[in-house]
Amino acid sequence: LRTMRAYGPVDKVGMVYNELEANSRLTVQRMQALGGVEGFATEAFPMPLDDAGAPDLAALPEQVRLAKAGGADWLYIPPDSFLNVNRDILTTAARDAGLPTFASAENFIRASHGLVGLVSRYYNVGQYVGYLAEQILVGGRSPGELPIRNLDRFSLIVNMTTAHDLGFYPPLSMLSIAEFV
């Protein structure tokens, strides 16, 4: 939230997500709670399901347009496997709608058209998972006895091509701390 607010006032955050993924539902709920505490509105746009009960990919650009039309200042992209696989469609729709994106995973910024994200680098996640695997395979520990914890190192990544396309450049305060791609 501080990162988004560094760009300017945040009145409303839109969120497109796949409600079939528990992590996405929980993240959307947390953002809604944060909005209540921090004084910004949120609007969630769950992906419609097709006849097979899967997210309807064809509806993805429209969900983004609805977020923009509903007055969102930002589109928050939660951790979501469906959105990650379809990140180009999602981030292109947001860019084309003039809606800046804040992503929770680096692929949306590095490998697509997302604007900015405060992310746990995949490299760091891999190191931690390797440590856990060692504890299980070499140390003989049960997976259930290992603590679940969040990583405490994050990277601020800004996609400058997207910033240029949107005409929405990072504030000077980010120049010394962000990684620009």
Where is each model-derived feature located?
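Short hydrophobic alpha-helices and adjacent helix-cap/hinge residues
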Residues: 1-181
